[in-house]
Swiss-Prot record:
Species: Pseudomonas putida (strain ATCC 47054 / DSM 6125 / CFBP 8728 / NCIMB 11950 / KT2440)
Positions of the UniProt region annotated as G3: 81-84
Function: GTP hydrolase that promotes the GTP-dependent binding of aminoacyl-tRNA to the A-site of ribosomes during protein biosynthesis.
Swiss-Prot/TrEMBL keywords: Cytoplasm, Elongation factor, GTP-binding, Hydrolase, Magnesium, Metal-binding, Nucleotide-binding, Protein biosynthesis
Region of interest called G4, as start-end residue ranges on this chain: 136-139
Protein name (Swiss-Prot/TrEMBL): Elongation factor Tu-A
Region (G1): 19-26
Region annotation G2: where it falls in the sequence: 60-64
Sequence segments annotated as region (G5): 174-176
Reactions listed under catalytic activity: GTP + H2O = GDP + phosphate + H(+)
GO cellular component, one term: cytosol
Lineage, uppermost ranks: Bacteria, Pseudomonadati, Pseudomonadota, Gammaproteobacteria, Pseudomonadales
Length: 397
């Protein structure tokens, strides 16, 4: 049993295990909960419970994910582990479980494998900011030179995808040993403790939504006689205060305006904060100057764009997606925040078609601008039906 109640005062950080099948991601996840329960008093979660993760639906896509939590001395960690490779792809692209940092599990006995590479690439594409490496199954490797070789390979692979390979912390150990409470050559519990300490020191505390620059996707626009124009929506991040200058970005040319009031539940407030549904009263903005799909932002914080590269997951037939592949020149709607915009898809060189259930990098050109940043999630739709999910990897123009 857990020794203490959930402590809200500790900063909260989201992490997850990534890496090739059978390299020990789930064993390490279970070992983390065990070691942290002994050292820091959080609850133990058994391997079998993590391995039989329940199905979840994120944007209509079926994903199996296990969520566990554990504490270090200074933080509370929420940790995701996926049983299958396809679940990782979907999870990372939809942002169902966003990670502030990832633990790359690589078997010291096998070295980097195809999914090791693919998960590092996915992490780069979807904007996972930090990776820490756990070289697992080190108890099965007698040769110190072999360990060094695998470590070098992993560092090279990280550098290939623009992670700081030379400076990435690599912990060598055995998750199975730690799970069994053993610690020969400090490869068991000591290594896992060291991993937790590394998470504490290497992954910076994420900037809370409320401390980021203000952004609210506009869902609806009203005109109130004698008061002016009100836009409503859920504030995604930051704070808006009365008299704040604001910009309206996307779909048309960017315009500037001023907040003259914030309303929630028909009450007037001095400010609106991240996570709240509210109406923002705008000075000098006409009802027809603004529409659903635009965003209200702190001036200069977000720019409108039309062309970007994306990492996309195409729904399978079973998930209600397309039954047939699509080809180059495919023109679906891209649903950003609150609206659909038509766009053209350019496939990578040598790729002729994309099958349902695939994940693919593509370059998209929209017919209208959208307020966009790297890491922004979107859905791909055909006539209102979701057929894919994606994330902006890199803005081009």
């Amino acid at each position: 049993m857990a020794k203490e109640k959930f402590d809200r005062s500790l900063p909260h950080v989201n992490v997850g295990t990534i890496g090739h099948v059978d390299h020990g991601k789930t064993t390490l996840t279970a070992a983390l909960t065990r070691v942290c329960s002994e050292v820091f008093g959080s609850a133990i979660v058994e391997f079998d419970k993590i391995d039989s993760a329940p199905e979840e639906k994120a944007r209509g896509i079926t994903i199996n994910t296990a969520h566990v939590e554990y504490n270090s001395t200074i933080r509370h960690y929420a940790h995701v582990d996926c049983p299958g490779h396809a679940d990782y792809v979907k999870n990372m692209i939809t942002g169902a479980a966003q990670m502030d940092g990832a633990i790359l599990v690589c078997s010291a006995a096998d070295g980097p494998m195809p999914q090791t590479r693919e998960h590092i690439l996915l992490s780069r594409q979807v904007g996972v900011p930090y990776i820490v490496v756990f070289l697992n199954k080190a108890d099965l490797v007698d040769d110190a030179e072999l360990l060094e070789l695998v470590e070098m390979e992993v560092r090279d692979l990280l550098s290939t995808y623009d992670f700081p390979g030379d400076d990435t912390p690599i912990i060598i150990g055995s998750a199975r040993m730690a799970l069994e409470g053993k610690d020969d050559n400090e490869m068991g519990t000591t290594a896992v403790k060291k991993l937790v300490e590394t998470l504490d020191s290497y992954i910076p505390e994420p900037v809370r939504a409320i401390d980021q620059p203000f952004l609210m996707p506009i869902e609806d626009v009203f005109s109130i006689s004698g008061r002016g124009t009100v836009v409503t929506g859920r504030i995604e991040r930051g704070i808006v205060r009365v008299q704040d200058p604001l910009e309206i970005v996307g779909l048309r040319d960017t315009t500037t305006t001023t907040c003259t009031g914030v309303e929630m539940f028909r009450k007037l407030l001095d400010e609106g904060r991240a996570g709240e549904n509210c109406g923002v009263l705008l000075r000098g903005t006409k009802r027809d100057d603004v529409e659903r799909g635009q965003v209200l932002v702190k001036p200069g914080s977000v720019k409108p764009h039309t062309k970007f590269t994306a990492e996309v997951y195409v729904l399978s037939k079973e998930e209600g997606g397309r039954h047939t592949p699509f080809f180059k020149g495919y023109r679906p709607q891209f649903y950003f925040r609150t609206t659909d915009v038509t766009g053209n898809c350019e496939l990578p060189e040598g790729v002729e078609m994309v099958m349902p259930g695939d994940n693919i990098q593509m370059t998209v050109t929209l017919i209208k601008t959208i307020a966009m940043e790297d890491g922004l999630r979107f859905a791909i739709r055909e006539g209102g039906r979701t057929v894919g999910a994606g994330v902006v990897a890199k803005i081009i123009e």
